[in-house]
From Swiss-Prot:
Induction record: Expression is down-regulated during biotrophic growth within tomato leaves. The expression is induced at later stages of infection when conidiophores emerge from the plant and produce conidia.
Active site: 108 (proton donor/acceptor)
Needed cofactors: Zn(2+)
Domain of life per record: Eukaryota
Binding site residues for Zn(2+) 1: 104, 106
Entry similarity comment: Belongs to the metallo-beta-lactamase superfamily.
Catalytic reaction list: atrochrysone carboxyl-[ACP] + H2O = atrochrysone carboxylate + holo-[ACP] + H(+)
Protein name: Atrochrysone carboxyl ACP thioesterase
Length: 333
């Protein structure tokens, strides 16, 4: 599998360059997906022909509906093979496209827009995205899009990106399904620009009670509620890990520590320097910023460096938490 999806456009809380070996190993374990697959009578999946360490088997394009006119969600990264594949597939099935919905601005989702307009000029004014580019139409929260056999409702889910939208497929008599974009992946977990918004979006997705997930990358998520529990647990565990480390540090009489020092406190000193600096530190910084917004941690600037501390320890309001008991130190601001 060629690494056509190996672009370096990545969110600030994660630098995948530091995880090339790990990502390469994960790719080898991914299930193979067909280029074109009719997942249900209403959902056709076409691979973006851009497989890679960050795009997995490639970006999924979804063709939605049962009639001649249908919706498309996401357009791949602009690969010529994708343009040929989608053109041949739609022609063979007698399908035309009414509207194109983009989950967010990242290039592996929007790169094929120009090819679609070249192939189908009538689509020029029917490209929809939250925070639209010039010539595109806006997608707003709870907006609905209808074609024969399918009604899709937009759900604003910022975090992975500020403009990120998921889409709920609402059809009577079928399990509720959601197109989850890059917020929830078919394999592994996603990256984010803002962890606080991302966590809110995870809860929002959970509240929709959809059973099936169609991600922008990877296989169908057959049990979306279970996947949501796992995602929320994973992020919450990271918060507890940070709080426990800060509490332990304070209990030893230390005042505060930098993000770099906190990463060493959590993961030890033997980490690869590149992994620590370009992957773990940006992510832990996102966790700290969320916890600061929640009133659970604070920081001071000393010698030009931001140094973090746990609020309760600095205020002397409770005893140090025992290892693994981070819940004892969670106090609202």
């Amino acid at each position: 599998m060629d690494d056509k999806g190996g672009y370096r456009q990545i969110n600030s809380a994660f630098n995948a360059c530091a995880f090339d070996d790990i990502l390469g190993s994960q790719m080898a374990q991914l299930p193979e997906l067909p280029d074109v697959e009719q997942l249900t009578p209403r959902v056709l999946r076409i691979l973006g022909q851009n497989p890679g360490k960050f795009t997995f088997q490639g970006t999924n394009t979804y063709v939605i509906g049962t009639g001649r006119q249908r919706l498309i969600i996401d357009t791949g990264g602009g690969e010529a093979d994708w343009a040929s594949l989608i053109n041949d597939t739609l022609k063979a099935r007698g399908i035309t496209i009414a509207r194109v919905l983009l989950t967010h601005w990242h290039g592996d989702h929007t790169g094929g827009v120009a090819d679609l307009i070249r192939l189908y000029p009538d689509l020029e004014h029917h490209i929809y995205k939250n925070q639209p580019d010039r010539g595109q139409q806006n997608i707003y929260h709870a907006q609905t899009f209808d074609v024969e056999g399918a009604t899709v409702r937009a759900l604003h889910t910022p975090g992975h990106s500020e403009d990120h939208m998921c889409f709920i497929l609402e059809e009577e008599g079928e399990p509720r399904a959601m197109f989850t974009g890059d917020t929830i992946l078919g394999h592994g977990t996603s990256t984010m620009e803002d962890l606080s918004s991302f966590m809110d979006s995870l809860q929002n997705i959970t509240d929709q009670q959809c059973e099936v997930g169609y991600s922008a990358h990877g296989a169908v998520i057959e049990n979306l509620p279970l996947k949501m529990v796992q995602e929320l647990r994973h992020k919450t565990r990271r918060e507890a890990q940070v709080l426990t480390a800060l509490a332990s540090y304070a209990s030893r009489g230390q005042r505060s520590l930098t993000t770099s020092e906190l990463v060493a406190e959590i993961y030890g000193q033997s980490l690869n320097a590149e992994t620590r600096a370009f992957a773990l530190e940006p992510f832990i910084d996102q966790v700290l910023r969320k916890l600061a917004g929640d009133g659970k941690v604070g920081f001071e600037v000393r010698a030009g460096q931001r140094k973090w501390f746990i609020m309760d320890m600095m205020q002397g309001s409770i005893r140090p938490a025992r290892s693994g008991s981070a819940r004892e130190i969670l106090v609202a601001a």
